[in-house]
Amino acid sequence: MARKSLIQREKKRQVLEQKYHSIRQSLEREISEVSSLDDKWEIHRKLQSSPRNSTPTRLHRRCFLTGRSRANYRDFGLSGHVLREMTHACLLPGMKKSSW
C-alpha cells in the first residue's frame, strides 16, 4: 500500500491540474496564434508562472485499491498484481486465467 502522503499529494496535483486546465489551454492556444516573438515570450512567462503541479504530465495513475503507481491498467484502474489476484478469484467478469 502506498503511503497516505503520496496519495494525498497526487490528489492535490489532480485538483491543481483541473483548476488551471482551461487557463493553460488558452495560453497555449495564444502562443500558437501569435506571430511576434516578443509576444510569445510574454505569454510563455505567464504560462511558466503557473504552479508546477498544474501540468498534466506530473500526474500518475494509481491503483485505487493499493495506491501503487506502477503497472496500472487503464481499463480497470488496478495494478498488475491486484488485477491478477482478482482474476484468479473470479472477481472480474470476462477475464480468463493466463500463465503470466
Curated annotation (Swiss-Prot):
PROSITE patterns xref list: RIBOSOMAL_S14
InterPro entries in the cross-refs: Ribosomal_uS14, Ribosomal_uS14_bac/plastid, Ribosomal_uS14_CS
Matches recorded under Pfam families: Ribosomal_S14
Record text on subunit structure and interactions: Part of the 30S ribosomal subunit.
Gene responsible for this protein: rps14
Organism: Cycas taitungensis (Prince sago)
Family, as annotated: Belongs to the universal ribosomal protein uS14 family.
Matching SUPFAM superfamilies: Glucocorticoid receptor-like (DNA-binding domain)
Designated name of the protein: Small ribosomal subunit protein uS14c
Alphabetically ordered keywords of this record: Chloroplast, Plastid, Ribonucleoprotein, Ribosomal protein, RNA-binding, rRNA-binding
GO molecular function, one term: rRNA binding
